[in-house]
Each structure stands twice: as structure tokens, then as C-alpha cells.
Amino acid sequence: TCAGAAAGRCWSRVAVPEFSAYITSKHANLGFMRVMAKELGPRGIRVNAVCPGWVRTEAAMLSLQNMSKRTGRSEGDLLAEIVGARLAHGAQVLPGLLEPDDLAAPYLWLASDGAKDMTGQALMLDRGEVMA
């Protein structure tokens, strides 16, 4: 049995104003993953997605910087809101940002026999940002 995984980001389950193209692409990733799971399942191939929340990467920090410029709010205030330091709508329940290394274990689990009966599913790894 083979296992495949596609990144969907937690925003693949929500609608966020001013991010229409990004949100649309993430919704499409989940749809594609589900279709592939249906098509490849009869061959014993599993296809699942990992949907991470905010991960401390250059791209995420650039996004934060752009949000700051667009809204006139400080990066620190925005980050505090995102990571749940202030319980705002859409904030994470568990504080802090994911680190890139935090993503390895879920992918390894999906590729293991521990996930042999799982296909077409989105594994939310977002510190409670989206509870769907």
C-alpha cells in the first residue's frame, strides 16, 4: 500500500476576506485529494491531506508583513491575535506558531501502517484554529 499526502492548509475549510485566490486554491487542493482517493483507492493507494495552520516560514512571515502594511496594524499585534494570545475570532486555541519540523510526524504517520485504513481525509494540524 502506498500513501500520498497533499498540503491543504487549514484555510481549505474556511472563507477569509481579502484572500480569495489563496482560499480558492486551498479548497481545490482538498477536492483534488478526495477525487484522487476515490480513483486510486481500488488500487490500494491512499491519498490524504495535512492541513497545517500558521507555520514559521519565510512565506508566512512575509504574509504577516503584508497584512501589517495593508491593515496598518503592527506585525506583533497581528501575530498575537493569530496565535491566540488574544482570543479573537479565528485565533488558534493552542498558543504559538508551528515550526517546520512539527509537520514531519503527521506525514510519517500517514505513510505508515497506522493509517492503513484512512484515505480521502484532511488531517487538521492547526492548533485549534479551525475546528471542522
Residue ranges and their predicted role:
Residues 9:
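Residue(s) in the substrate-gating loop at a strand-loop-helix junction
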Residues 14, 95, 106-109, 119-132:
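Short C-terminal tail/terminal secondary-structure segment
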Residues 14-21, 42-43, 95:
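Active-site loop immediately N-terminal to the catalytic Tyr-X3-Lys motif
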Residues 25, 33:
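Active-site helix of classical SDR
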Residues 30, 52-62, 66, 70-71:
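Short, flexible catalytic-loop segment of classical short-chain dehydrogenase/reductase
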Residues 40-42, 55, 111:
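A short hydrophobic alpha-helix cap/turn motif
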Residues 41, 46, 118-120:
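Short, small/polar-rich loop/turn modules that mediate ligand/substrate recognition or access, typified
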Residues 75, 89-103:
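A conserved structural motif in NAD(P)-dependent oxidoreductases
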